[in-house]
A protein has these predicted regions:
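C-terminal and inter-domain tail/linker signature
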Residues: 1-124
Length: 124
């Protein structure tokens, strides 16, 4: 609440979804995410940018974490995975109002032993 507008919008990647308001963000994304991962590394923002009311950062990988709990309906693997992330923000006044986040989930799941694209073609 110190940095976000109460009616903030968080536009998450496919498979995770989007949320409206700080409370819903905590319930639908940040809480489950924090509960599913341990041993999270520091972020590695290779690129930072800002223009007007917009800013963002990118990292390949942005951070690593161990899948120690259920995430996206998948069980814990105990494996460490890389997160490739693009994070773009919009500011309104002194607070953040919107966040668009792109996570290469195909890459993450492949590191966990799940090849999503191969599994999709097998189902046909």
């Amino acid at each position: 609440r110190r940095t976000w507008c109460e009616d903030m919008l968080w536009w998450g990647p496919a498979g995770i979804g989007s949320t409206y308001t700080i409370a819903r963000y905590a319930q639908q994304h940040s809480g489950p995410f924090r509960g599913a991962f341990s041993d999270r590394s520091k972020t590695n923002h290779i690129c930072r940018l800002a223009e007007g009311h917009y800013g963002g950062f990118f990292g390949w990988p942005n951070f690593t974490a161990r899948l120690s709990g259920e995430f996206m309906g998948m069980p814990a693997t105990g494996k460490v995975g890389e997160f490739r992330v693009i994070d773009i923000y919009r500011r309104a006044g002194d607070k953040l109002a919107e966040n668009w986040i792109f996570i290469d989930l195909l890459h993450f799941w492949k590191q966990q032993g799940v090849d999503v694209l191969t599994n999709i073609t097998k189902d046909k």
